[in-house]
């Protein structure tokens, strides 16, 4: 009974709050003519233009919207193009044979042109006050939208989007940009501003907190004070997001070319902990531990590789980020269980990755590669005979060597630095020189550990057990 009353009160208060917001923030449309903006059709995907023109020809409104418009206005090349329209998903499917409908939470139409997919969304409406709330819109107890397929007008759609800079609409009918929420001004001033009441919008979808940080880092903008204020105290809402979705978001955050700046802001707004709880436990006040240094360096290196259009692998990123928690876990298991270090290390890999996968559903294909990179660290110091050549034949040797170099860079460890330097020279040498380097190792072998002999038991006396 109490639960019913609480849910009823929550729904009434939420509706009153939403109605108050709508009353205060009635959309006022500003039309920016072609001569006052930088968008040209030659910079837009031909397939996106085909979708827009066909929808217009069929009598529907259709606009380019979201990050594509934002990036074009900033002079950047968009990664993809999204379309919004007053046509329903079923109506869109009737117009395009190469279309399929996707999504339960948000019903979308994907129009496929080979590898390129043009996403088409119907204008969203306000979910409160609709007679069809129960079947088309559903909220969780924390206010999160679980399902939202209320359709509306372009004015309502503009208010339903997340940030003002993503709520700009480009029309191929008259080449204008429509702005209902002041997005153009925020774009010019470099402001990330959430549309509507920030706490309500974050509760609807907590991932918006991650998006705010990502856009601020990616676009070199700042988050407005009212948008930033609730983030630290609402950060734990991310624990309610499915781990698979958080994994995808983590790649967008850390492997999009602005990973280091994003990492700093994630820590500032307390958003790193829900994503990487294992790592956060090892943070220090001055931020200068070996683990924090290796995270900073691997993200800077990743950013440089992306800027130079080089490939990056999430498995290597995770191998570096979780390396020091892994070492501490392995040492703890070895001390508590009495196992050999190699066996304790193997168990620690399982424990660290299992905990990581509880918050981020890291796919097995990546955890397998991460394990390979870690296991090779234990073999890098064993180079005598043919071991060095065999090690170099391993598919993940190069990634393992890169991690070794990173470790040498962030640790004040002369032995580790010499080992990394040896491997760098060995890889760059011709076979005869490599053989000479290995002979030098044989001439100066590392001191062997003395194995303790098993104790001899005293002879058992008669009458004793």
UniProtKB/Swiss-Prot annotation:
The keyword Phosphoprotein does not apply. The keyword NAD does not apply. SUPFAM superfamilies: Nucleotidyltransferase (SSF81301), Poly A polymerase C-terminal region-like (SSF81891). GO terms for molecular function: ATP binding; poly(A) RNA polymerase activity; RNA binding. The active site is at 80, 82, 162. InterPro entries: NT_sf, PolA_pol_head_dom, PolA_pol_I, PolyA_pol_arg_C_dom, PolyA_RNA-bd, tRNA_ntf/polyA_polymerase_I. It is an enzyme of class 2 (transferase). Keywords: ATP-binding, mRNA processing, Nucleotide-binding, RNA-binding, Transcription, Transferase. Signal peptide: none annotated. Gene3D superfamilies: Beta Polymerase, domain 2, cca-adding enzyme, domain 2. Residues 448-459 have a biased composition (Basic residues). HAMAP family: PolyA_pol (MF_00957). Belongs to the tRNA nucleotidyltransferase/poly(A) polymerase family. Adds poly(A) tail to the 3' end of many RNAs, which usually targets these RNAs for decay. Plays a significant role in the global control of gene expression, through influencing the rate of transcript degradation, and in the general RNA quality control. This is Poly(A) polymerase I. It comes from Salmonella typhimurium (strain LT2 / SGSC1412 / ATCC 700720). The lineage of its organism: Bacteria, Pseudomonadati, Pseudomonadota, Gammaproteobacteria, Enterobacterales. The gene is pcnB.
């Amino acid at each position: 009974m109490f639960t019913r009353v609480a849910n009823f009160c929550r729904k009434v208060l939420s509706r009153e709050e939403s109605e108050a917001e709508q009353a205060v923030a009635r959309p006022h449309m500003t039309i920016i003519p072609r001569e006052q903006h930088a968008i040209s059709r030659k910079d837009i995907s031909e397939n996106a233009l085909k979708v827009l023109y066909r929808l217009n020809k069929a009598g529907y409104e259709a606009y380019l919207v979201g990050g594509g418009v934002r990036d074009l206005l900033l002079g950047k090349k968009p990664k993809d193009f999204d379309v919004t329209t007053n046509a329903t998903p079923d109506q869109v499917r009737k117009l395009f044979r190469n279309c399929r409908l996707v999504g339960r939470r948000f019903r979308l139409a994907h129009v496929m042109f080979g590898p390129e997919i043009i996403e088409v969304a119907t204008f969203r409406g306000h979910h409160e006050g609709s007679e069809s709330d129960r079947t088309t819109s559903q909220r969780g107890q924390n206010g999160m939208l679980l399902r939202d397929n209320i359709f509306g007008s372009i004015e309502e759609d503009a208010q339903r989007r997340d940030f003002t800079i993503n709520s700009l609409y480009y029309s191929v009918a008259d080449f204008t940009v429509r702005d209902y929420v002041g997005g153009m001004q925020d774009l010019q001033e470099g402001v990330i501003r959430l549309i509507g009441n920030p706490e309500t919008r974050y509760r609807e979808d907590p991932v918006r907190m991650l998006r705010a940080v990502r856009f601020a880092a990616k676009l070199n903008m700042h988050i407005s004070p009212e948008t930033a204020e609730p983030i630290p105290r609402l950060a734990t809402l991310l624990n309610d997001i499915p781990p698979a979705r958080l994994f995808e978001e983590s790649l967008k955050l850390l492997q999009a070319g602005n990973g280091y700046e994003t990492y700093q802001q994630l820590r500032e707004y307390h958003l790193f902990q829900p994503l990487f709880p294992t790592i956060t436990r090892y943070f220090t006040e001055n931020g200068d531990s070996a683990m924090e240094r290796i995270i900073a360096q691997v993200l800077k290196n990743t950013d440089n590789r992306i800027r130079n259009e080089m490939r990056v692998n999430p498995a290597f990123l995770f191998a570096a980020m979780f390396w020091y928690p892994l070492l501490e876990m392995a040492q703890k298991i070895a001390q508590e269980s009495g196992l050999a270090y190699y066996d304790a290390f193997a168990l620690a890999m399982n424990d660290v990755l299992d905990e990581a996968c509880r918050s981020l559903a890291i796919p097995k294909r990546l955890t397998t590669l991460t394990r390979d990179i870690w296991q090779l660290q234990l073999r890098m110091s064993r180079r005598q005979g043919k071991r060095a050549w065999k090690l170099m034949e391993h598919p993940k040797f190069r990634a393992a060597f890169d991690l070794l170099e990173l470790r040498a860079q962030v640790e004040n460890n002369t032995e580790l630095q010499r080992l990394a330097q040896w491997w760098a020279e060995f890889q760059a040498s011709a076979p005869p020189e490599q053989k000479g380097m290995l002979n030098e190792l044989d001439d100066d072998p590392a001191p062997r550990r003395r194995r303790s002999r098993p104790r001899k038991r005293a002879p058992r006396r008669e009458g004793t057990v």
